[in-house]
Design a protein with these regions (language model features):
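Primarily recognizes the serine-hydrolase "nucleophile elbow" in alpha/beta-hydrolase
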Residues: 2-63
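Short, conserved active-site loop motifs that form the nucleotide-linked donor/cofactor pocket
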Residues: 17, 88, 120-121
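Residue-level signal for short, function-critical loop segments
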Residues: 23, 94, 128
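A structural signal for the main folded, soluble domain(s) of proteins
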Residues: 27, 39, 45-48, 63-65, ...
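Short, surface-exposed basic-aromatic patches at helix termini and helix-loop junctions that form
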Residues: 33-38, 109, 141-142
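Hydrophobic/aromatic beta-strand patches that form the interior of the parallel beta-sheet core
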Residues: 43, 89-91, 123
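The feature captures the conserved acid-bearing segment of alpha/beta-hydrolase catalytic domains
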Residues: 53-111
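C-terminal catalytic histidine-bearing segment of alpha/beta-hydrolase fold enzymes
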Residues: 105, 113-148
């Protein structure tokens, strides 16, 4: 798979494998974190850990039950301890008009409530819609510099 190709190409130094993504890519990065402990840190920009509930607002209702059932195994909120044991960056604009920021807030609060927020960095950018800002990119680079 992709992981093996990265290692084979010599793109992973000292087993320092990390994943970052924005929007759906951020959700994918969170899902990867639930199943791949070899990933040392993850940055999720304007994504959501609540895949099944977000899917209900983004997709037409016709095949929703089957689709959300497949997403459930990857949902971060069902695997909080597995994502809390490594550095995690959550970044979201508080005016996001595509992926509601409440999913990021709920994940942040769930980790705090369970006492699992020791490796969490959660950054909010005021007035930002569904866009990646220069500040978000700078924060992501700084995060990986610190945690890789």
């Amino acid at each position: 798979g992709l992981r093996d190709a990265l290692y084979d190409a010599g793109l992973v130094a000292d087993n320092r494998l990390a994943v970052a993504g924005a929007s759906m890519g951020g959700m994918t990065a969170l899902g990867i974190m639930t199943h791949h402990p070899e990933v040392r840190s993850v940055a999720c920009l304007m994504g959501s850990g609540y895949f099944t509930s977000l899917a209900k607002t983004l997709f037409p209702p016709q095949d929703l039950t089957e689709m959300t059932a497949r997403l459930a195994d990857w949902e971060v909120t069902r695997a909080l301890p597995r994502v809390a044991d490594r550095p995690l960056l959550l970044w979201h604009g508080d005016a996001d008009d595509v992926v509601p920021p409440d999913g990021t807030f709920r994940l942040q609060q769930a980790l705090k409530r369970e006492g699992l927020d020791g490796n969490l960095t959660c950054l909010w950018e005021s007035g930002v819609r569904h866009r990646i800002t220069p500040a978000a990119l700078e924060a992501t680079v700084a995060f990986f510099r610190q945690h890789l």
